[in-house]
């Protein structure tokens, strides 16, 4: 050891042999050369103490010098060198209880009661001074020759007024659970009580609890078991004493002063009187007073009943008084606990409401975005679907209560020695409880969501459930109704034939038509008051008055029971009639004398020429041309000289007026979009030119030869300009991609074709035909060979013949331009079945050719596999898809869950693909060995 200088005060001690060794160093027996008394010198290495901790420890040791108690080893003085700390302590000759137990065996209960009563007195003194021993065990309990117990080994002692102490705070087998768990709030005098119980078990059994398990398992068992195992061969009082020491709640664990009043301690303290035999001493009852009553001990251990002294009235009165005080204390504690629980519950309610509002806002934004993308939003989360939001009044009251309780700031008691929840002294370095008041440190400001927003989200989700389950249906890819801030309430369809005499009146100028405006068009059938009606089959030469008005609000179709229509900006013009009108097959209306004048006035009201983009939809994927189901048509409805190239025609969703020009028959032109004719499965539209020309003869009751000539001339003009001989095609072939009936291969695309943009939906394309020159028969097995010549009252046979000749002339010129045979019903599902040779390509207009390359979804094979560059695929990524035997370019349009949608570029169709079919090929795509065959729009002769 270091040499102590002679000039130092510690040089008076002469160091002798070592009498012990601890975790911090050795203990030597020393002689005080000045007094001749023996003392113990404890040597501690400074290397185990950090420089920051050293000053506080020195101060703590000096404070320990002030401790003076008969059951505590006297601390004499300390000394410091460069390597060690020296403590001069009172020397105890008897040694420790561990050595005595090892030498003489286990102790009996009476002797243990005497010894531990002195230990409790020493602990009570230390705890009153604020000192926590932290290492109570048999090795640190010394005994003199007279049998006096002394608490020693303050190497791990801490003074509770200093923040940090020595690193070693006990031995694992004697440590309390809160110390093992390193609970900073548990650094109190209660840990010495737990260690005292473990030391008592050591004296009874010879080993501390869980000694046979080892260090780590013993610590685990100490934390998880309710209490250490208690021997069965002990008295009930001792068992009760041990259970009181092993109470896990530090607030309910008794103090050393309270344990001194335990019956097991008291019954062995007294000295037996001479009159009483020593064999059967009866313990004397010591009256309890203050906090150390025997009643308070009973509250710490279950199942133990202390016998009451029925002969002592004062003792009973004292017990009742203590019991009343205890009950009042428990009542007060329960009241405070309930108040704290209520506060936390209200705070949790408020935070839950804020969380629901944030989730509701996120769900609403997600649903709106998915609807715009055409996706079906998922159902609401359970927190919004099942739970109901609290009312505003309850939330306001909870906020008021929170503010009130926060302002009081006394709901949670401080962790000092004056805390009403425990009698143990805590270390000031770590508070036992939370701060004294609960104050909201920050206010969460989230965007407020009203109940209407949440309900809007719910309704939005419910409305989207009406969509089809498959994301590849036509309704799914159709433009959503809210794109233009309005949507029609229902879709009705045109069930009658299109052979109508149209009278259109536009009440608003084109400049007044905006994106958010809607045109409500009413179709009315003029009744015929004349009696000169011939029995013509399916001759619907009706006069239709069309009145167009502009409104900025959502309107419903006209209430007319015969025929109606409405205009939608995102989906062109919708025409429809009721099903009841289908039975009126024979409507033979004749015109009055002023038929020509009416037609002229009609054209004047339209501003000479008016173009209306229009289409009709069906609710099913396939269109069957039957009399009971509507047909889906699409195109541009043109009034007047719409084929004049010098006139600029309004594009998609427009109802615009052009310059003045001569009036002509309205013609529905083909829309130039890559749409497929949606399953018009081999339905024949048999149109005979001669019969249709006869149908277009508007006969007058009086002498109307000139009127008929004008009418037929207009028809011929439209026939020549509008692809000539519109009715020359007999059958529609769904697999031959061309959807135009009788279209000349060398024709130029009309103005309506050029300015009508593509729609997003996969709607079927209607064939081009004249509303007056074409009668659409919905029966595929019937021919339109009807002699619908309405004879005039003055026998205008010559005029009719001239009209027919004019029409036939148009048909002949059509045949001269391109000798095209009528379409056949050869359904070929192979996409490469139709071929054409480059030398025989008769299509002159490239735009017309490209615009008609549309495919039916049923003709393209299903996607078997997909090759992408990035996994998982993202929207806009290029990829390759395998359909049948070929690979095609595609692009990813939508990604949703386990599937995503790709658009196959050559076919302009969409396919839904599972992620399981995707193959990652970052370097190259599959290459097909065979050249992809081309499609022919027309069959070669």
From Swiss-Prot:
Chain intervals for the UniProt region annotation (Disordered): 270-294, 394-490, 526-560, 579-611, 648-857
Domain called Protein kinase: residue spans: 13-265
Compositional bias (Acidic residues): 832-847
EC primary class: transferase
Keyword Metal-binding: yes
Gene3D superfamilies (alphabetical): Transferase(Phosphotransferase) domain 1
GO cellular component, one term: cytoplasm
GO molecular function annotations of the record: ATP binding; metal ion binding; protein serine kinase activity; protein serine/threonine kinase activity
Changes seen on gene knockout: Cells have an aberrant response to waves of cAMP stimulation.
Catalytic activity: L-seryl-[protein] + ATP = O-phospho-L-seryl-[protein] + ADP + H(+); L-threonyl-[protein] + ATP = O-phospho-L-threonyl-[protein] + ADP + H(+)
Cofactor section: Mg(2+)
Residues binding ATP: 19-27, 42
Ranges of Low complexity composition bias in the record: 272-294, 446-463, 529-556, 681-739, 779-831, 848-857
Record: active site: 135
Annotated GO biological process: intracellular signal transduction
UniProt-listed SUPFAM superfamilies: Protein kinase-like (PK-like)
Keywords assigned by UniProt, alphabetized: ATP-binding, Kinase, Magnesium, Metal-binding, Nucleotide-binding, Serine/threonine-protein kinase, Transferase
EC numbers for this chain: 2.7.11.1
InterPro entries (UniProt xref): Kinase-like_dom_sf, MAP_kinase_kinase_kinase, MIP_CS, Prot_kinase_dom, Protein_kinase_ATP_BS, Ser/Thr_kinase_AS
Pfam families from the UniProt entry: Pkinase (PF00069)
Compositional bias segments (type: Polar residues): 394-405, 420-431, 654-663, 740-778
Function: May play a role in responding to changes in cAMP levels.
UniProt family annotation: Belongs to the protein kinase superfamily. STE Ser/Thr protein kinase family.
Protein name: Serine/threonine-protein kinase DDB_G0283821
Organism of origin: Dictyostelium discoideum (Social amoeba)
